[in-house]
Structure formats: structure tokens, C-alpha cells
UniProtKB/Swiss-Prot annotation:
InterPro entries: AB_hydrolase_1 (IPR000073), AB_hydrolase_fold (IPR029058), HAT_MetX-like (IPR008220). This is Homoserine O-acetyltransferase. It catalyses: L-homoserine + acetyl-CoA = O-acetyl-L-homoserine + CoA. The lineage of its organism: Archaea, Methanobacteriati, Methanobacteriota, Stenosarchaea group, Halobacteria. The gene is metXA. It holds the Pfam family Abhydrolase_1. It comes from Halorubrum lacusprofundi (strain ATCC 49239 / DSM 5036 / JCM 8891 / ACAM 34).
Amino acid sequence: MSTVPTDHGVAALGEFVFECGQSVPDLEVAYETHGEFDGDNVVLVCHALTGSQNVARSPAPERNEGTRGAGQAGQARAWWDDIVGPGKAIDTTKYYVVCANVPGSCYGTTGPASERPADLDLPEEPDHDRWGTAFPPVQVEDWARSQRRLLDHLGVGRLRAVVGGSVGGMNVLEWAKRYPDDVDRVVAIATAGRLDAQCLALDAVARRAIRADPNWNGGNYYGEGRPSPDEGLALARQIGHIMYLSKASMERKFGRRSAGRDSLTREEGDLGLPPEPTAAFFPYREVESYLDYQAEGFSERFDANSYLYLTRAMDEYDLSAGHGTDADALAAFEGEALLMSFTADWHFTVEQSSSLAAAFRDRDVPVAHHVIDSDHGHDAFLVEPEHVGPPLRDFLVEGVGGRAVSDDGGGGGNDSARPERDHAPVHASLFKG
């Protein structure tokens, strides 16, 4: 397979005033590009909550390595490599792909873990050199504005498309709302115009897990010899992973299988938790082992304060803000839209994407809502390239008339308009026991 030019860097964009009214004197945005710019072939990819600018693999091996706060690992490293690349759905031999780490994150863009200017006047001076919780509150709107600033810096005007999944899909919707004249097509995958109450509740518990960790120390855990709140961050991530999987996929992957009775007598993973008092009698199950494994890896690569900031940005996003309805918010957009949803995703449901499709249709925007029958849950947009790729590829080339693009016909909440489910759309059981 042929290689394509890739580039990466950190752009210093000058003073940036956030939607909250607070500012940083020089916003730095870490970015990556793939392909060659020909003037009208730019596809902006918006990463999900804990993703990074490293959307696809680079021909340079050192670009595919990294550790917390500087490089990428796990989902953050080449997190959509099955979709972005030569000959793939977002074909980097045709498109100039740009992906930028969002403000508030920790992969090179300015965020809580970044060094703050020494001459910065703060009401309470932290005893370390990082922004910490003095960093301004971040919103999805700030992500879109920082991306527009970065594209201006790169000499890019109008975009062929903006593509993203999960909260990255919210980022996409904000582009259609805020910069309707700057983009031809938008692709919002597994997303919604706002979170529902159940997701808000789970995110709140995740943030409390971090804040309850004594090592969080009010967000002031930076500096030599200070332990990070890894236990709290790990628990927060475990809550997230439960949200990302469907009931059916968890049963298929793990069931009630034991990972070994002896495992629970040790401290659980490296999370610092004491063993359960009943550990000698009951099994340590595979689903617990999976959650511990995911949590340990995540704590090594992500910043706890960034998790607080980014989940709050996701929670607070409302597409209709400043407008009466979602349709009003999208009224100025004159391009085409593709929405993709997954039948077993209870984090961002099929119904929520149907509602967005209705909002686009209300403003006569050509739109398709492509529903994928999958039991993978919210993670499907990352792990099912064979289903995500074809409609995405054809939409970028042909719009809503693309051969692999289907539409639910505006079925909305009518189950007869899409494949039958084998799961409950809401995990009420997560609030029990």
C-alpha cells in the first residue's frame, strides 16, 4: 500500500478567549495531517473524549509511540487507523486529513497539565508550574473555534467535510451551527445534540470518583514527588467503559465467567484498593478483570484534571443553545449531512440521531440517517470499520446519494423502521445494587 505525506506539530495561536470569558495568553494546539492539500480536499476529523490528534498511523515509527502527557497510547494512538489512510474510507491519497487535539486535553494542546506562564496573575497561586484547576472551563464550542483558528494558521479555508464520533460528533454539529459557510458535508457518528439524564448522572459519578481520591488534592497533584490520582481516574474510566459496551456485548464477552478465585485476594490491579472481605469465597470475574486492565492502561496515559474538564464539556453541550430548537441552530447550514447510529448504543441512541436527522430535514438539508445493526454498543464506531467505512466513503464522494448510504426514512422512534433489537435501550440496572 502506498504511503502519503504526514505532518505533525504544535501551533501557537496566540491569546484565546474561551466561551466562559476567561482566556489563556497563548493557546497551543497539537495537530496531525495526512495527505496533500490541493485547495478543496480537506477533511477535519474530530476525536472522541480521550482521543488525540493521532488519528492514523504514520510512516515514521517514532510517531506511533508515546506516554502520558506527550504521546499517545491505547485508543489515543492511531485510534481510527482502520478508517483513515491510503485506500480506506477517508482516503489520504485523495483527502488532506487534519485532526487536532482539543483544548483541555493532555496530548500537546493547552490544558490543565500544561505549563502556565510564570507571570500569570491568579487569585490563588498554585505551588506548582501547571495550570491545574486554574485552567478556564472548556466547552465544545471552544473546540470548534480552536480548530477554525488552527485551519486558518495552516492556510485552509473551506472544508470538504467534518467527521467525528461520540463527543467528536457534537464537535461536528457545532461546526454546522457555527461555521455553516465553511463546510460542504458533515458526518456525525454515534452522537446527539445533548446528553440525556442517565449519561449526565454516570459522568457526574465518574468525576466524583476522581475528586474523592486523596491524591487529587483539589487538582494540585503536579510536581516532583506528588502522586497522581490514578485510583480515582481508573474508577472513572471503568464507569466509562460500562457506558461504551452494550448489555449483549458484555454478556457475550464475559458472561459470569471467573478469572480465578485467587486474583481478588491481592490488591485489585494496581489501583491501590484493599482486597474485598469476601475475596476468599467468591470469584474475581472476567468482566472485573477487563475493567481493571482498561483502567490501569488509561491511568498511565491520561490526566485526571483533563478528564474532569472534558466530561464536563460534553455534559454541558446543547446544540440548541442560543436558538429555539436544534433545527433553528442548523438553519444556516446548506451542505449535506450524514448521521450514523448503532442499534445497541445506549450512550447515544438511534432515537437521538433520528431527532438530529429530523432537525436537518426541517431546514431542507439533504440528510441520511444510516442505522447499523450492531451489538457492540457505543464502541461500535471504533471497532466496526467494515460497517462504518462504506457509507462514510461513499458519502464523502457522492453525498447522501452514495451507494452504501442508507436512510431510516425519518422513522425516529418507530422500531419498525430499523432492525429489531435484542437489548434494552437503557441500562436501568446500573443504578441498582
